[in-house]
């Protein structure tokens, strides 16, 4: 599954925060079940799967076997790089798309940045930067909002289409896509110190923050352009990812770092309230309620999602 790395990652967080060895044991067991994925080249989500599981495991334990899995995972991800377009292909070609790249793919670049450090192979870093740069050029509208899917030509690298798959419409503001962009470019700034990446993260965040229909509790609707607001489902996974990105940004040397932390704190107050945080033993034992996977696909509507809990 695309999302198989988030639960092991959450277990690593529990071990990190409590020091209780039972969580280390459980995290290791769940992480090591994913080892075979290190050779998977059929989609881009290996970054999600392995960065959240093995990435946290290596960060916390320093186990060299975990480092080796991460390097091999990065090699697998790098096979999807398309030089003419300068991007990592997200999904495989079909009748509709030739080289589709989704904004979610920004979340996979951290695996490449880390692998460059672990291995000394600068090609991982160069691929990550190339992907971030081309995505910045092609995915974003003048107001800072982003498309979900950009389809490129493999032959000459030109853009064929700008679309959405999981949002309300091609020109709508699909909320979780904006969260992926904010988080992904915050990581790019942290790893490269190139200010343009931070500027992009903040431009997209400020666009979301300043939307007139942003709810008072700061938990976005699944798509901020959906037609039936305020009677549209919220997406808690968007809120948790934005908060996580803002906490990251607040640790950086940026103007008004305290303001970004304050906004993240406000999101966390909402997420911790009974409106969104499930009572113990309910909600399938997930922490958070009211996330949305994909309304256009009639999939995971108003349900708990493991990546909402993770972020």
Question: Residue ranges of each PLM-predicted region?
Answer:
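Glycan-recognition and catalytic cores of secretory/periplasmic carbohydrate-active enzymes
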Residues: 1-311
């Amino acid at each position: 599954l695309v999302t198989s790395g988030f639960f092991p990652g959450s277990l690593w967080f529990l071990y990190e925060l409590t020091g209780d060895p039972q969580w280390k044991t459980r995290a290791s067991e769940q992480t090591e079940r994913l080892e075979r994925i290190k050779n998977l080249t059929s989609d881009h989500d290996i970054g999600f799967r392995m960065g959240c599981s093995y990435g946290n495991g290596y960060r916390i334990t320093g186990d060299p076997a975990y480092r080796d899995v991460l390097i091999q995972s990065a090699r697998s991800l790098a096979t999807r790089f398309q030089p003419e377009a300068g991007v990592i292909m997200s999904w495989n070609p079909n009748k509709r798309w030739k080289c589709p790249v989704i904004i979610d793919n920004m979340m996979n670049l951290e695996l490449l940045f880390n692998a460059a450090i672990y291995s000394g192979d600068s090609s991982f870093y160069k691929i990550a930067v190339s992907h971030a740069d081309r995505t910045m050029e092609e995915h974003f509208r003048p107001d800072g909002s982003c498309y979900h899917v950009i389809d490129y030509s493999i032959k000459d690298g030109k853009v064929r289409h700008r679309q959405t798959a999981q949002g309300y419409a091609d020109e709508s503001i699909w909320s979780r896509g904006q969260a992926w962009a904010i988080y992904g470019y915050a990581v790019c700034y942290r790893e490269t110190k190139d200010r343009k990446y931070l500027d992009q993260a903040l431009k997209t965040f400020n666009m979301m923050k300043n939307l007139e229909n942003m709810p008072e509790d700061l938990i976005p609707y699944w798509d901020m352009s959906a037609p039936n607001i305020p009677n549209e489902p919220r997406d808690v996974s968007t809120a948790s990812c934005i908060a996580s990105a803002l906490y990251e940004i607040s640790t950086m040397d940026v103007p008004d770092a305290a303001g970004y932390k304050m906004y993240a704190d406000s999101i966390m107050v909402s997420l911790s309230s009974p409106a969104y945080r499930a009572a113990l033993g309910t909600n399938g034992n997930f922490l958070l309620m009211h996330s949305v996977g994909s309304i256009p696909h009639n999939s995971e509507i108003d349900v708990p999602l493991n990546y909402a809990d993770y972020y």
